[in-house]
Regions:
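A short hydrophobic beta-strand element
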Residues: 74-84
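Hydrophobic pocket/interface hotspot
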Residues: 8, 20, 28, 44, ...
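Short, surface-exposed coil-to-beta transition loops
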Residues: 64-66, 92-99
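Short beta-strand segments enriched in hydrophobic/aromatic residues
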Residues: 24-25, 84-86, 99, 115
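Short, cysteine-centered beta-strand-loop-beta hairpins and adjacent loop/turn segments enriched
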Residues: 60, 86-94
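A solvent-exposed, acidic/Ser-Thr-rich amphipathic alpha-helical stretch
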Residues: 21-74
Length: 126
């Protein structure tokens, strides 16, 4: 997992979406919690990519990682503790989240995002 996740994290930090997406399996599953309209489970690389495009469109490309506090890795998983920031119209939000990644050894096969304050996320996307 370390090599895959290290490459994924570097692509993410470099804003290199082609490199990041290449590390997703074709049947990757992305879980986004919440009650807002962008929450849900997105199955498949294209659905995951479409979700990211929708998020970026909604915030005018302003979403960014402003801090990576820690990364924990094992053979099959990585867990990242991050702070992100986004602006949507008159609203701005800086939020902490935990993202869990699962791999098959070659690709990221599943992700789960857990926001520290899910109510503020729901309100931001309302």
């Amino acid at each position: 997992m370390a090599a895959i996740f290290d490459r994924y994290l570097q692509a993410w930090l470099d804003d290199d979406w082609d490199a990041a997406v290449a590390l997703w399996s074709e049947d990757v599953v992305h879980h986004v919690p919440g009650r807002h309209r962008l929450a849900g489970t997105f199955r498949g690389k294209q659905a995951f990519l479409d979700h990211y495009h929708q998020v970026f469109e909604e915030v005018g490309g302003t979403i960014e990682v402003v801090g990576i506090h820690d990364v924990l890795q094992s053979e099959d998983h990585a867990v990242a503790l991050v702070t992100e920031r986004a602006v949507r119209g008159e609203r701005s939000l800086e939020f902490n989240r935990v993202v869990v990644y699962h791999t098959d050894g070659e690709h990221i096969t599943e992700t789960w995002s857990f926001d520290f304050d899910p109510y503020s996320i729901d309100e931001f996307w309302a």
